[in-house]
């Protein structure tokens, strides 16, 4: 365990609460001390929804520490059952309250006897998994609970009857997901074009009573690696349902996704051929393929970029940059360190290096050393980019409220490909833009911090050298500063004068 003031993925209970609060009429009770109860505030601030967050905190206070939690937890469960009348109550401790080592299973069993709704304890090890892994496990646990319940009651006997027309489930659309609502809308449109019905979307907006119908679909779609694969594997094991793990992000991967659907339907006796649809969308409907061959996009060829985010988005954006737009990806990385083997296999051929870490300082230093023309990452990489004066496009959670847009901004499908191309192109500094702003004045005339993220307090710039540095065009000033400081350190200098600047320029050949 280590102290951190920044985490890419939150603690396990956040993942459990994200999944539970995505379902309709499901309430969560968090057994936690004050301080762990920030999920309500975070979700209310970020998610653009009208409803209150259905989470109650059963506070671990001095009385609980003295007398135990059983009476309080059971009372809160029974009270919420009466007040809210939910279909399900999910009980979860946090990593802090788990230290008490209380028998929450016993509390849940006792509460179930006095409650009309179902009560489930989240089956998550709060010390071993993070938010994403816990969300994946919680979704699978809830699905398994209701399918098992349906089997016991006789509502589900053997393999369920398939829908008359080809249909699918979409697994993994959740609260606080990165552009999830927009991606769902785009996926629905894509499936409608392919004449495929939608059976269920889980967990977002789903009723737990409908989960017994999951097996009626012909196949499952898992758009994100972070949430849904465990449920897809369980449904495959339980009902023999095939599933698609290809993320339809970018023109090439969207075509692969559609061909995978075609293969699954052909294997189930439906002779479909989607090649004409793929060609029409790629060549005439989507603007992404055309734009990638335009003069504007060719200006980006060979430019350097770095990518960091969750496995799904970082891998997809890396492939789009390298394969579809000809941009040189210096390194790509993910904070999903448990998924390193898959990430390496996916993007190893599209970038020079791979960085798997949860340490934001390592990411920041890697960005400073690479000196890319653009960054594609999370909100933390955007902060780093501002300090280094490098533009950043946000492509993955964790994110600020401005990345929960009101307007339609999908990342999946053909419209998503258009949005991504816009994001990538607009993230690069175009030509002499910064330099012209400095020459003619304007909104960007403020003084900018060029300080490297590495410690450089040992070097002093003379007033003349600083004035000379300020004459350098803004889009290369940071690089000139770093090269000069590197030159000075290698020679043991503590002060940078104009002479040192020119010597460094000569040494670096620029």
UniProtKB/Swiss-Prot annotation:
GO terms for biological process: light-independent chlorophyll biosynthetic process; photosynthesis, dark reaction. Its EC number is 1.3.7.7. GO terms for molecular function: 4 iron, 4 sulfur cluster binding; ATP binding; metal ion binding; oxidoreductase activity, acting on iron-sulfur proteins as donors; oxidoreductase activity, acting on the CH-CH group of donors, iron-sulfur protein as acceptor. Its cofactor is [4Fe-4S] cluster. Substrate binds at residues 431-432. Keywords: 4Fe-4S, ATP-binding, Chlorophyll biosynthesis, Iron, Iron-sulfur, Metal-binding, Nucleotide-binding, Oxidoreductase, Photosynthesis. The active site is at residue 296. Binds 1 [4Fe-4S] cluster per heterodimer. The cluster is bound at the heterodimer interface by residues from both subunits. It is an enzyme of class 1 (oxidoreductase). [4Fe-4S] cluster binds at residue 36. Pfam families: Oxidored_nitro (PF00148), PCP_red (PF08369). It catalyses: chlorophyllide a + oxidized 2[4Fe-4S]-[ferredoxin] + 2 ADP + 2 phosphate = protochlorophyllide a + reduced 2[4Fe-4S]-[ferredoxin] + 2 ATP + 2 H2O. Protochlorophyllide reductase is composed of three subunits; ChlL, ChlN and ChlB. Forms a heterotetramer of two ChlB and two ChlN subunits. This is Light-independent protochlorophyllide reductase subunit B. The gene is chlB.
């Amino acid at each position: 365990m280590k102290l951190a003031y920044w985490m890419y993925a939150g603690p396990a209970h956040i993942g459990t609460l994200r999944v539970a609060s995505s379902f309709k009429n499901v309430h969560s009770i968090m057994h936690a001390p004050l301080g762990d109860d920030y999920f309500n505030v975070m979700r209310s601030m970020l998610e653009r929804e009208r409803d209150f967050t259905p989470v109650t905190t059963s506070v671990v206070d001095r009385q609980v520490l003295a007398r135990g939690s059983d009476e309080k937890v059971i009372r809160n469960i029974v009270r919420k059952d009466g007040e809210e009348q939910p279909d399900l109550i999910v009980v979860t401790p946090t990593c802090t309250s788990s230290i008490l080592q209380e028998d929450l299973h016993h509390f849940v069993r006792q509460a179930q006897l006095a409650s009309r709704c179902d009560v489930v304890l989240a089956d998550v090890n709060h010390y071993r998994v993070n938010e994403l892994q816990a969300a994946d496990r919680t979704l699978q646990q809830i699905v398994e609970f209701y399918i098992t319940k349906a089997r016991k009651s006789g509502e589900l006997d053997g393999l369920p009857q398939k829908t008359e027309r080809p249909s699918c489930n979409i697994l993994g659309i959740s609260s606080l997901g990165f552009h999830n609502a927009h991606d769902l809308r785009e996926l629905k449109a894509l499936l409608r074009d392919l004449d495929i019905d939608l059976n269920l979307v889980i967990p977002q907006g789903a009723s737990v009573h409908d989960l017994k119908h999951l097996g009626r679909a012909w196949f499952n779609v898992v758009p994100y690696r972070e949430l849904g694969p465990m449920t897809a594997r369980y449904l495959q094991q339980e009902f023999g349902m095939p599933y698609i793990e290809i993320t339809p992000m970018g023109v090439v991967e969207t075509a692969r996704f559609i061909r995978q659907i075609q293969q699954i339907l052909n294997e189930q006796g439906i002779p479909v051929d989607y090649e004409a649809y793929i060609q029409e969308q790629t060549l005439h409907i989507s603007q992404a393929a055309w734009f990638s061959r335009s003069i504007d996009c060719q200006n980006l060829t060979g430019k350097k970029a770095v990518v960091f985010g969750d496995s799904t988005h970082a891998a997809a954006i890396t492939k789009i940059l390298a394969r579809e737009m000809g941009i040189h990806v210096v390194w790509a990385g993910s904070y999903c360190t448990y998924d390193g083997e898959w990430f390496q296999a996916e993007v190893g051929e599209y970038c020079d290096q791979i960085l798997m870490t949860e340490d934001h300082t390592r990411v920041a230093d890697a960005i400073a050393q690479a000196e890319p023309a653009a960054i594609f990452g999370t909100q933390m990489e955007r902060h780093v980019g501002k300090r280094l004066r490098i533009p950043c496009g946000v492509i993955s959670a964790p994110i600020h409220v401005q990345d929960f847009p009101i307007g339609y901004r999908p990342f999946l499908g053909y419209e998503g490909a258009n949005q991504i191309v816009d994001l990538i192109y607009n993230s690069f500094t175009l030509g002499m833009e910064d330099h012209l702003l400095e020459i003619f004045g304007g909104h960007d005339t403020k003084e900018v911090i060029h300080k490297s993220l590495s410690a450089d307090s040992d070097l002093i710039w003379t007033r003349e050298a600083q004035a000379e540095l300020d004459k350098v065009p803004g889009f290369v000033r940071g690089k000139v500063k770093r090269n000069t400081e590197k030159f000075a350190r290698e020679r043991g200098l503590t002060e940078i004068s104009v002479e040192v600047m020119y010597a460094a320029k000569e040494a670096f050949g620029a």
